[in-house]
């Protein structure tokens, strides 16, 4: 894990959200050397490429995300002069592209041995986190800005057993409150 601003490096076995030196965003640096032939014949989901994802393979938490269909976009493709396809990410388990990152994040949470995960969300993240936490058997706490979340997404979080708390304010205020809780109670925060 490396800071995008100052280059400070951190081990991937510690829970850290921003650079302790300068406060900037962190990035995962993953240098891999695998033959693409190993992916042939595997089930078409995100974990088809497990060698490219730096986690303990025995801890994988999956709902069979990824492998979503392609949709050909003839009109726009013709206009741009290209053969254009888009992915139908609504085919993921919770109906969002967020599931792709969540499977990796939840797998990392299991690898780190955490018991509680949390997020601030306006919908898709809370739905995804709660589904993956339920699959992993982890406690899930979700902070939502009051009145700013689609009922379907709220229902998904509750259906999966998340502890949902409404925060008076906007998303940024919900995130600030969740970050404070995560630091105080040592829960794994999904950003």
Set out the residue ranges of the language-model regions.
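PLP-dependent amino-acid enzyme catalytic core
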Residues: 1-191
